[in-house]
Regions:
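Phosphodiester-processing cores and adjacent nucleic acid-binding clamps
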Residues: 1-270
Length: 270
C-alpha cells in the first residue's frame, strides 16, 4: 500500500496549488485513508487540515518540508513530543534561515521521523538519529538506482513519496509562474532548484507503482511509516502556561517584566 507522506497545499505560499478540500477529494478518489500535510517551513494550514480530514474520515499526519538556502529534509511527527519539537525546529529555522539543518535537528530530533535524499546531510544525521527514525526519500525526479545506492551505503530504509505540489500536470505552468514571481525572475531565468518539474502531482497508488516499478518495498514503507505517525489530534482546549498569581495587577506587572526581559534578549535594546 502507498500513503502520500509529502504533500504541499496552498499553505506553501507561492509553491503549492492544492486547497485542503481538493486534497481530501484527491485522497478519497484514490481510496486513501491517511494523508500527511508537509508544507514548506510551516504548519499554517495544519489545524484546518485536521478539521477537513475529520470530515472526510482521513487520518491526518503532521509534517514539514524543511528547506533552507542550502539543505532540505522532510520531517514527520511520531508523537506529541515530536509535534512540540517540530514547532521548535520551525522556529529555529526562521530565526536563522541560513542555519545548518543538522545543528537544529541535533537538539530537537526526538519524536520525529526524518527523510532526506542528499547523502551528505543523511550522513550527518545518521550520527545522532537512529535508523528507526531516519530514511532515504525516493521522490519524483530521482533515479531509483541512485537512491538505492545511498540506502545501501548508509544502511537506511527507503520511503517513496510523491512530493506533491499540484493536482495534475496541467497545473505545472501555474506553479512555474508563482515561482517566478516569488524569485523575482522571468520564467527563462529560473534556477532549476527554484521550481518543481511537472512530475510533482497527486498520483494514485497504481500511478506511483508505474513511476517507481523497481521500488515496491519503498512504496510499502510509506504505509509502514504512516502507521507509526501520530494521527489523533485535539485542538479543543486552549493551553495556557501555569502561573499562580492571584492578584491581577501583580500578573500584569509580571507579564510586563517578562516581555521586557525577552525583548532585550532578542533585540538588545528597546
Amino acid at each position: 500500500m502507498f500513503v502520500h507522506l509529502n504533500t504541499h497545499s496552498i499553505y506553501s505560499p507561492m509553491r503549492g496549488l492544492l486547497s485542503l478540500p481538493e486534497m481530501m477529494d484527491l485522497a478519497k478518489s484514490c481510496s486513501m485513508d491517511t494523508l500527511a500535510l508537509t508544507d514548506v517551513n510551516g504548519l499554517w494550514g495544519f489545524i484546518r487540515f485536521v478539521q477537513h480530514c475529520r470530515s472526510s474520515r482521513i487520518n491526518p499526519i503532521a509534517g514539514v518540508n524543511l528547506i533552507t538556502n542550502k539543505q532540505e529534509v522532510l520531517i514527520l511527527v511520531e508523537n506529541q513530543y515530536g509535534y512540540e519539537n517540530l514547532c521548535r525546529i520551525i522556529s529555529s529555522m526562521h530565526d536563522d534561515p541560513n542555519g545548518d539543518i543538522s545543528d537544529i535537528l541535533r537538539k530537537y530530533h526526538a519524536g520525529v521521523f526524518v527523510l532526506g535524499y542528499d547523502i551528505s546531510i543523511l550522513k550527518e544525521l545518521s550520527s545522532f538519529i537512529p535508523d528507526s527514525h531516519l530514511f532515504v526519500e525516493l521522490r519524483p525526479g530521482f533515479q531509483e538506482s541512485t537512491i538505492k545506492s545511498i540506502s545501501e551505503e548508509l544502511k537506511l530504509e527507503i520511503v517513496a513519496t510523491g512530493d506533491v505540489y499540484f493536482k495534475n500536470k496541467t497545473f505545472h505552468k501555474t506553479h512555474m509562474a508563482l515561482r517566478a514571481i516569488d524569485c523575482n525572475s522571468t520564467l527563462s531565468d529560473l534556477n532549476e532548484f527554484d521550481y518543481k518539474s511537472e512530475d510533482h502531482w497527486f498520483r494514485s497508488e497504481a500511478e506511483m507503482v508505474h513511476l517507481f516499478p523497481n521500488s515496491l518495498h519503498a512504496l510499502n514503507n510509506s504505509k509502514y511509516l504512516s502507521d507509526r505517525c501520530k494521527t489523533d489530534w485535539s485542538f479543543i482546549n486552549t493551553i495556557f502556561p501555569s502561573l499562580s498569581l492571584k492578584d491581577r495587577h501583580q500578573a500584569n506587572k509580571r507579564l510586563n517584566r517578562e516581555v521586557s526581559i525577552g525583548a532585550k534578549k532578542r533585540y538588545g535594546y528597546l
